[in-house]
Regions:
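Alpha-helical transmembrane segments
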Residues: 3-130, 134-178
Length: 178
């Protein structure tokens, strides 16, 4: 989808910038701000009529940077917790990515298909099939990403309850995905 990886990446790196700044990790905060600048510039040229495309390599780089920053944040939360809801907020920030990956792998493996075989069972393909289009699909997934982040802010201190709600939602969605 046009701008999907960049839009989700923009949301994730915005939250990560704040979290790294709270932890005093200015080098990582600057890295996140740099990626935000690159993604905003990319989005400017990616919307209709699109003149630049991210492709597989670009989305892999964005995903790699998200993974590195996520691991660093988890390391920070468990070595020097500054904010009590940090791990929950970090998970909520990347929830859409984790959920889509888990859902697709579950569907493929349960159908006896290799999890590495390409198909159209990802969330954005499902949304496009519902006649929302590329921009609509990007907006819906970005809105859900922001919704999960906003929901964790008041619930984040209740780690066990947040974890149970998360597991319940994932279980329901995995069951209904077939």
């Amino acid at each position: 989808l046009d701008g999907l990886a960049a839009t989700i990446g923009l949301i994730i790196f915005s939250i990560f910038t704040v979290l790294f700044h709270i932890h005093g990790q200015q080098a990582y905060a600057v890295l996140c701000v740099s990626v935000i600048g690159a993604l905003v510039s990319f989005l400017y040229f990616n919307f209709n009529p699109a003149r630049v495309f991210m492709g597989d390599t670009g989305s892999l780089v964005v995903g790699f940077l998200i993974a590195i920053c996520t691991l660093k944040l988890f390391n920070l939360w468990f070595t020097s917790p500054v904010v009590s809801f940090g791990p929950s907020l970090t998970l909520a920030t990347i929830f859409i990515l984790i959920f889509d990956l888990t859902r697709v792998v579950f569907i493929r493996v349960s159908n006896g298909i290799s999890p590495f075989k390409a198909d159209r069972s990802h969330l954005h393909h499902m949304i496009c099939r519902q006649q929302f289009g590329h921009r609509g699909g990007t907006f819906i997934l970005a809105a859900f990403n922001i919704l999960f982040i906003v929901l964790v802010l008041p619930l984040g201190k209740l780690r066990f309850i947040t974890f149970l709600i998360f597991c319940f939602c994932v279980a329901i969605l995995l069951i209904n995905s077939k």
